[in-house]
Amino acid sequence: LTTHLRRAAGSRVRALLALMAALCAVIGTTALTTTPAAAADQRHPIYAIAHRVDTLAGVDAALKHGANSIEIDVCAWWNPNEWRAYHDCSSAGDNRLGPSFDSMIDRILSNANAGRRLSLVWLDIKDPNYCGERENRGCSVAGLRDKAQRLTAAGIQVLYGFYEYHGGNTPDVGGRGWQSLEGRLGSLEGITSTGTRDQVQGAFNRSGSGFPAGRRAMDYGDSDITKGFGNCTEATYNTCAELKKGAGDRDAGRLAATLSWTTTYNDPWYVDKLLGDGRVDGIIAGYGAFTGVREYDDSWQCANSIGLIRDWVNRHGGTHRMAGPGDRLFR
C-alpha cells in the first residue's frame, strides 16, 4: 500500500508505524505479566506438575493428560558443552543420554503454538556446579538459563530447582551454579530449594541475597509421598506440616510459592491434604515409589495422577482453579 502514497503522507505513515510498534510492545509486555482476567480471579491457581518429563513424548503426554506444568531433570555435559534431559547424571558418565534440552524446548514451544501452552517448567538441576560460567558457559547454569529464555519469551514461567545432591565443599545450594542466577532472574523466573521450612529459610538467608522474596519457592516431599508425610498438624519435620508453615511464609510475602512431590494415581488422600490443609501451590505427580519411579509417559497411571489434582480442583471450584498461561507465581 505504501508504494502508492505521496511524499506528503510520509510523516503520517511513520507516525502510524510508530504507533503500531508501541502497541506491539505493550502487547508483548502484557503477555509476560499476569493477565487482567487472572488477576481478577481471586481463587487459588494450582499447578499440576508432570513428574520426570525427560522425553519428547513425555511433553506431549503431560499436556494430553491435562498437566499445566512439567518437571524436567537436566544434566550437563562438557566438550561439547550442552544440557540434556536425563535423571541419573552420575551413572551416565561420558554417555550423552536423553534428548537435548534444546529439543525439549522446541517440543514445548511447538505445543504452545498449537494452543497447548504450559504455565510452568520446573528444571531439576542435577549437577549445577559441573561447569563454570566463565570457563564453559554452555554447560553451566548460566548457559541453561540462556536457553530457558526461549520459554520465558513465550510467556512460560521457569523454576530453577536446587536440591542438595552433593553438599560438602561443592554444595548445590549456594554453589557457583546457584550464584550465577543471583540478581538475574526475570519476572517469569524463580528459584526453589528443597527442605523443611527452616532449612529453606536458612538456605536463602545464607545464600539468597540476590533473590527477592517474590522469586523464592520452597519444595518438600519424597518419591514415596507416604514417607514422613504426617497429617499436617505436627510441630516440625513432616512433609505436610512443613509445607503448611511454608504457605504461611508465602502469605506473609516471604516466599513466592510452596510445592510438593511426588503423588501417583492412588494418592487421593495425600493430594487432598496437600492442597487443602497444606495449601500448596502445586504438586509433582506421575510415577512414584509405589509404581516404580521412571520417566513420564502416556500411561493410565500418569494420566490418573494428574487427574487426581484436577479432580480435587474441580470439587473446590469456589476457592481453587487450575493455573493458566496468564497466571504468575513470581512477583
Q: Residue ranges of each PLM-predicted region?
A:
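Catalytic cores of phosphodiester-bond hydrolases, prominently lipid phosphodiesterases
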Residues: 41-54, 58-331
